[in-house]
Amino acid sequence: MINRYSTQQFEWLDVTDLNSDEQQLLLEKHQIKQATLAYATDTHERARYSLDLLDNSEMIIFNIPQADKEHPNQFTISPITFLIKNQTLFSFHSKETSGLIKKILATESNDLPVDTFVLRVLFDGVQHYHQIIEHLSQQRDEFITKLDHRIQNRQLIGLSEIEKSLVYILSGTQTNLLLLKSLSKKHADLSNNKDNQKLIAKLLVEAKQAEQMAKISLDVTERLSATSNNLLNNNLNDTMKFLTVWSLVLTIPTITTGFYGMNTVLPFSKNPQTWVLICLITLLLMLLVLYYLKKHRFI
């Protein structure tokens, strides 16, 4: 599907779920190269910047966070591609990332030059990373608060999902930072627009901050997850130790009374008060075993 928007300085074609007819239109009418279109529509393409002076086109592939359809609090990254050709802007992305386009339409001015407009969009994309990282950090803190009371598998799974999301987010911030560094170098060489150069410099600062936020948040989450797993393992070890000790102690009455259940002659077996002696012997043996285990720090 192709949505057309017109601003005061350029035409914008927003492309999602490209079909064969629309692809042919872009190839023939707008003279977009087949290879360029393949890169622009590749959902696994890494973030990068390319400039084609012969074709008079620029392509910017930027990774943005994308929420999972079934689990809105889990995130991956998805590319959004901007192609500038002959003062026409083409954007290629999935339906799941249409939220950023809607935000752009609602907030950005329509009298900006096309290159400035794209830089402003990238700035909004970087700011979106900040919001997602803060959201994931808040979720993590909520799970940790619950873990302080009782460790449950549900909280551990939640921490694992946050950790996985942060891995994707960190990867996205790092590749975007490489893209922006390349963009900064090319614009410094080719552009005389000081406002754009300042905007790119600001973008770099925000992108570095997003990368650092993602690194710190991921590191904290990994450490907390490891600590929680260790505590869970320790609790399991304590439970197994408790069961083992009491299994051992509780075998003593069975062994002691078992002797007097055999059809053999034993001391005091004819005495009606022998059961009291058996109980005392059993209790003494149990106390001795408990003392031995505690002395050697088994319990």
Go through each PLM region and give its residues:
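Peripheral, non-transmembrane regulatory/ligand-interaction domains of membrane transport proteins
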Residues: 1-185, 192, 202, 206-209, ...
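DNA-binding recognition helix and immediately preceding turn/loop
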Residues: 155, 192-195, 217, 222
